[in-house]
């Protein structure tokens, strides 16, 4: 009798954890998807206002040719550092709002890609990235194998990638640029799986609803960055230039 009660209690607890995990991960993906939609809307909106009859409008000149372009480029970086620094001291609702502001700023920053690549190739690469991301994230969620070792290796790879990009600013080597793009795709593909598993494991810590909400936001931000960076590297490889 006692054994049956214990088994019943264990099964009920496991079911509750499973349902809670699904709800938590769904929240992460919902925040991420909303942020991506906002990024796309802002990028296309600015591009629409910046280009007329194949030439830059005054708004386009302001955002892409004036010193304001550096604010547009660097604002997302400043925002992500601000969110990371303030995450512990702000509410989950404010963290969510800051994340969406960051996504909007990223859209303004990425709008210049629509000046470089054809709209058709941008859309095509976006769907390639989305399909790849989905498969990799599902793998990270379902695999029983720990990816922590892979994650440490990939994070070191990110630093190497940054150094290579800085070096190539001075070398302007098309061959090195191609290698950077290939390696970048591989690194952020791996990080998508690793980060998904890490975000999933974060759920199992006993947290209050406010902390869980913040974890959901930081998880969405992490996967959002994986997606955006993988998209940019794939676009460099597969995009058709104007």
Predicted features along the sequence, with ranges:
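A hydrophobic alpha-helical transmembrane-helix feature that marks the membrane cores
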Residues: 1-242
């Amino acid at each position: 009798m006692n054994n049956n009660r214990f088994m019943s209690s264990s099964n009920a607890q496991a079911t509750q954890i499973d349902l809670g995990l699904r709800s938590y991960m769904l929240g992460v993906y919902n925040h991420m998807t909303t942020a991506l939609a906002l990024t796309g809307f802002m990028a296309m909106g600015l591009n629409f206002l910046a280009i007329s009859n194949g030439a830059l409008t005054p708004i386009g000149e302001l955002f892409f040719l004036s010193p304001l372009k550096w604010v547009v480029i660097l604002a997302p970086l400043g925002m992500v550092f601000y969110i990371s620094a303030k995450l512990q001291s702000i509410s989950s609702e404010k963290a969510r709002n800051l994340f969406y502001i960051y996504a909007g700023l990223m859209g303004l920053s990425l709008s210049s890609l629509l000046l470089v690549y054809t709209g058709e190739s941008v859309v095509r690469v976006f769907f390639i990235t989305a399909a790849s991301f989905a498969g990799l994230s599902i793998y990270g969620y379902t695999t029983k194998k720990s990816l922590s070792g892979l994650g440490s290796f990939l994070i070191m790879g990110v630093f190497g990638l940054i150094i290579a990009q800085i070096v190539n600013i001075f070398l302007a080597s098309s061959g090195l640029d191609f290698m950077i793009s290939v390696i970048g795709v591989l690194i952020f593909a791996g990080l998508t799986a690793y980060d998904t598993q890490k975000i999933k494991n974060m759920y199992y810590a006993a947290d209050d609803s406010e902390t869980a909400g913040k974890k959901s936001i930081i998880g969405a931000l992490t996967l959002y960055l994986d997606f955006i960076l993988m998209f940019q590297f794939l676009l460099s490889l597969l995009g058709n230039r104007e």
